[in-house]
Curated annotation (Swiss-Prot):
UniProt cross-references to HAMAP family, sorted A to Z: RNApol_bact_RpoZ (MF_00366)
One BP annotation, GO: DNA-templated transcription
UniProt function note: Promotes RNA polymerase assembly. Latches the N- and C-terminal regions of the beta' subunit thereby facilitating its interaction with the beta and alpha subunits.
NCBIfam families tied to this protein: PRK00392.2-5
Record's GO cellular component terms: DNA-directed RNA polymerase complex
Protein name as annotated: DNA-directed RNA polymerase subunit omega
Gene encoding the protein: rpoZ
């Protein structure tokens, strides 16, 4: 069973660099990505279909999207408060 993803390595590299540049502390950015990946791995443990993308790659993509689109974060925060 081979996992395949349609993630472009150049795009992934660019998004990773954006995350690191936006962070004041490179170590903290890496730890946040690792923690999110770990959380996603355990959340998606039952969903074998969604495991085509590795958790670290998914975490980088999600965090990069949140960085580029801050309204995502505010929408999530508003839904949590309700």
């Amino acid at each position: 069973m081979q996992k395949q993803s349609n993630i472009n390595s150049v795009e992934l590299s660019r998004k990773s660099e954006e995350l690191i540049k936006a962070s004041s502390n490179r170590y903290r950015a890496v730890v946040q990505v690792a923690n999110r990946a770990k959380r996603r791995r355990y959340e998606d443990f039952d969903n074998f279909d969604e495991q085509a993308v590795k958790p670290v790659i998914r975490a980088v993509l999600e965090m990069s999207d949140e960085l580029m689109q801050p309204e995502i974060i505010s929408e999530v925060g508003n839904n949590i408060d309700r």
